[in-house]
Curated annotation (Swiss-Prot):
Residues 1-49 are cytoplasmic. Belongs to the TcaA family. GO terms for biological process: response to antibiotic. Residues 439-460 are annotated as: Disordered. One of its GO terms (cellular component) is plasma membrane. The chain crosses the membrane at residues 50-70. This is Membrane-associated protein TcaA. It comes from Staphylococcus aureus (strain MRSA252).
Length: 460
């Protein structure tokens, strides 16, 4: 369609004269317009052919850009740079993320210790150089899959390993810190509470038993902790240093606000050593001059006393209180017995025992003769007066005499004797019919006019 330049009437392209006003159209314009339309159509065809090529070229450019972007973040060199930057910038959270594994969660505090350990024991410049060289060699190698970065002293501090690929093209490098188990060995059952792997942790260790408290990456640690024993609760730290271990474990040094008590006794020479006890905060324990008692919290007073026996009687010291302000890591205390009181009692009891022993010597001398006569004559009456009638021992000896199985005895010696009311226990050493010495324990009863009779016996 075209418009008449004179009246504006619309007309077909091939019309020569306007039907409205009779204006004669210029045929050259129609030819020009036709030629132009054909050119436009030709150009459109060319453009349509070029579009797929342009799209393909654009996609290729995008792929190349994407490859370089992926390489910048996923190549072994890029992975190495991420770890190096985190260590250089003390980014403990990033280091913790990079070193954490499914089996061992590393928290930011461990990572902080690890960063400092690398800088102290390897040196940052040397570490970066060693790491880059190790990654380069592993990346080029067709056989090696792992290698270690070491400290100046030769301890492994970082394991670098190949772990598959990233996006087909790039080796995936895995960075893992080797671990060790810190171990405790408390003197008594102890509960430890501290933070590890970003979580609160509790470890219960039995007395004198080696107990691991977890797995830790290399470092010099001073971990805030609480510990609890029968003696109380303690605040302090668990300390351990990887430099001090060449094995899979590292010893823990406990650093708590605690007091250990050394006890010295005076006036105790007459007391039986096995009977001596120390009571600290109402807890009684055997005494030893070489033993250290505790630990006890330094923020609470301690009460302490001692006891011991002499000739069956218990003697005690006065109870002393050690103020919390006077408690030190090693605290010494002296407890005094009333030595005069003990000596007077021992002297009195020894006189009584000597008198009792003399009576028993006389009694058992007669008893052994009567026992042997009853055996030789097969007559229980010889020995019956030495044994209390109605006792199980009375019936037993009578039966043995009738069966001829009574044992002959001789040379009785009184080893020990104690009297409690009308009952006497005596340890007697005898020679049996085979000529062998045997120790027997007898129980006797003292009746009217101090008459002694046996009621029980047993071999010691």
């Amino acid at each position: 369609m075209k418009s008449c330049p004179k009246c504006g009437q619309q007309a077909q392209d091939d019309v020569q004269i306007c039907t409205q006003c009779g204006h004669k159209f210029d045929s050259r314009q129609a030819l020009y317009r036709k030629s132009t339309d054909e050119d436009i159509q030709t150009n459109n065809i060319k453009m349509r052919k070029m579009v797929p090529w342009a799209i393909g070229f654009f996609i290729l450019i995008l792929i190349i850009i994407l490859f370089f972007l992926l390489r910048n973040f996923n190549s072994p060199e890029a992975q190495t740079k991420i770890l190096v930057n985190a260590i250089e910038n003390n980014d403990k959270q990033k280091v913790a993320t990079l070193l954490s594994t499914k089996d061992n969660k590393v928290d930011s505090e461990e990572a902080k210790v690890y960063i400092n350990y690398i800088k102290d024991e390897v040196g940052l410049k040397q570490f970066v150089s060693d790491l880059k060289n190790t990654v380069h060699k592993l990346n080029k190698s067709k056989t090696s899959v792992a290698s270690y970065i070491q400290t100046r002293s030769g301890q492994n501090i970082l394991r670098v390993s190949k772990n598959g690929t990233r996006y087909i093209f790039f080796d995936n490098m895995s960075f893992t810190a080797p671990t060790k188990q810190p171990i405790v060995k408390p003197k008594e059952k102890t509960k430890y509470e501290f933070k590890s792997g970003g979580k609160k942790k509790m470890v219960i260790a039995e007395a004198n038993k080696v107990t691991p408290i977890g797995n830790f990456i290399p470092g010099t640690y001073r971990i805030p902790a609480m510990k609890s024993t029968e003696n109380g609760d303690f605040a302090g730290h668990l300390k351990f240093d990887f430099r001090q271990s060449n094995s899979e474990t590292v010893d823990v040094t406990e650093d708590f606000e605690e007091a250990n008590i050394t006890v010295t006794l005076k006036g105790d020479t007459k007391l039986n050593d096995s009977s001596k006890k120390v009571t600290i905060n109402d807890r009684e324990m055997a005494f030893s001059s070489s033993k250290t008692y505790g630990p006890y919290p330094q923020n609470k007073d301690i009460t302490i006393s001692a006891s011991g026996k002499a000739k069956g009687k218990t003697f005690t010291t006065q109870t002393k209180t050690i103020k919390a302000s006077d408690l030190k890591y090693n605290t010494e205390i002296t407890l005094n017995f009333d030595s005069e009181d003990i000596e007077d009692y021992v002297e009195k009891k020894e006189k009584e025992e000597n008198s009792l022993k003399n009576k028993l010597i006389e009694f058992f001398a007669g008893y052994s003769l009567a026992n042997n006569a009853a055996f030789n004559q097969s007559d229980f009456d010889f020995v019956s007066s030495y044994i209390k009638k109605g006792s199980s021992f009375y019936d037993d000896v009578k039966k043995r005499v009738s069966k001829g199985s009574l044992m002959m005895i001789s040379s009785p010696q009184i080893i020990d004797a104690e009297k409690h009311g009308d009952k006497i226990t005596a340890t007697v050493r005898l020679v049996n019919e085979n000529g062998k010495q045997v120790d027997k324990e007898y129980e006797l009863e003292q009746g009217p006019q101090d008459r002694l009779q046996l009621i029980k016996t047993s071999e010691k």
